[in-house]
Amino acid sequence: MSSSAPIGVFDSGLGGISVARQIAKDMPAEHVLYFGDSANAPYGIKTPEQVRALSFDIVERFVRQGVKAVVIACNTATSAAVNDLREHYDIPIIGMEPALKVACDRGDVPSDPHHIPQRVIVAATPLTLRERKFATLMDRFDSQNTIFKEPCPDLVEIVESGRLGDHDLVMRTLHGYFDQYDMEHIDSVVLGCTHFVFYRDYFRELLPERAAVIDGNEGTVRHLGVVLESLGKLAPEGATGGVELANSDPSERIAELSRKLLNV
């Protein structure tokens, strides 16, 4: 596989555009093929078997297009399908997981040997929070920290329907999920869905100034770079990269919304 081959990036819909955008920013020589499966969104309320089948269909599409790696820019699809995809394909398959370690590590102070327990909300889809992969991740950190799981399916729908700019709707939806918590005593919110990255400014409005809003996009793209470099597959310096957008929903509304989110 040539180092100038593209990278395939997919999501259940439009959320993974936030990851494609991060790749374009951090790895500008890379050519990204983005595929959003908006016709089948949301994945977060489907069964793991349904998500696996959809994920395999998309990766097959990428393989036919000659990609050198695939990024599953979807926490839900990662939870349900990443292990099976890695067993089946001989190209790197990079997954996403909620950046819980980053949130909990904020309690480690270099000058103090004692961990400061963190109070963390993980906002994600229902399926991500139900899957064994997340339970295993949570088991690593919940003995020293207080971790709240908050499924937020409506946040996916708001992005997919193009209503992200409706401030009143978004804040009303966020308050519906998070007013049950004493936000003054929350240390961080982990955005465990790539759709939720587009809500970063709204979460900042919701949270006290000292609290962090954390997502896994930068770490995922950094890992992608390390993997490609180790294989000698980074695009040549000076190559003209970019992002090509495709979607299972062929409507102009989705195409226009995709372009808008890529350039937010």
From Swiss-Prot:
PROSITE patterns: ASP_GLU_RACEMASE_1. Disulfide bonds: none annotated. It catalyses: L-glutamate = D-glutamate. Pfam families: Asp_Glu_race. Belongs to the aspartate/glutamate racemases family. Provides the (R)-glutamate required for cell wall biosynthesis. NCBIfam families: glut_race. This is Glutamate racemase. It comes from Bifidobacterium longum subsp. infantis (strain ATCC 15697 / DSM 20088 / JCM 1222 / NCTC 11817 / S12).
